[in-house]
Design a protein with these regions (language model features):
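Conserved P-loop
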Residues: 2-122, 134-137, 148
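Intrinsically disordered, low-complexity domain-flanking/linker segments in eukaryotic proteins
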Residues: 125-126
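P-loop NTPase motor core
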Residues: 130-179
């Protein structure tokens, strides 16, 4: 018997084009379950909207078949925004480029994302699926948020710093590629 390898699928589209909504079609196969990992702050809400409003699937049909977790990119607080604004007002681009990072400790969401992938736990049910390197048979892993991943990688490199120099950009893109 030939052992088939699941096909990797890349679902690209503009914001609001229906990428998250399309994930619900996976549930048409009663033998499949969806692991939904999002970096979009509204991702889980969009998925729930697709389930309940677009496709109108009764909760009993999907409740034990979807496992979701979201890790949002960091956001600067008011004090950090003030610090960044003061720095911008006092330095030219060269001076900004020489900064080693601003408030990097507040932008470690990329590390959180790796930990979630290492030991995935559904935020809806508390179900632990473990290491996502090996997706369980009968499950489909959907990662919703390349933009969020890129933002997290950049923020890991520079924090809230308002500019990147070429080396910092290289570090951020290498981080995305390794993910």
């Amino acid at each position: 018997m030939i052992k088939l390898k699941p096909a990797p699928i890349l679902n690209l589209g503009a914001p609001g084009s229906g990428k998250t909504t399309a994930l619900v079609t996976i549930l048409a196969d009663p033998d499949l379950k969806l692991i939904y990992l999002s970096t979009d702050p509204n991702g889980e809400q969009s998925l729930l909207h697709a389930l309940t409003e677009v496709y109108k699937i009764p909760e009993a049909q999907w409740k034990n078949r979807i496992f979701a977790h979201t890790v949002e990119p960091g956001a600067a607080d008011w004090d950090t925004l003030l610090q960044v604004s003061e720095t911008i007002s006092l330095k030219n681009y060269q001076g900004l480029a020489q900064e080693s990072g601003i408030e990097k400790a507040g932008f470690r969401q990329y590390i959180e994302l790796i930990n979630v992938c290492k030991n995935f736990t559904c935020s809806w049910t508390g179900t632990r699926l473990g290491d996502l390197t090996f997706v369980p048979p009968g499950h489909v892993l959907a990662f919703d948020g390349l933009s969020g991943l890129s933002t997290m990688a950049r923020d890991l490199s520079i924090g809230a710093k308002p500019s990147l120099h070429e080396g910092e950009w290289n570090v951020a893109m290498n981080t995305v590629e390794r993910f």
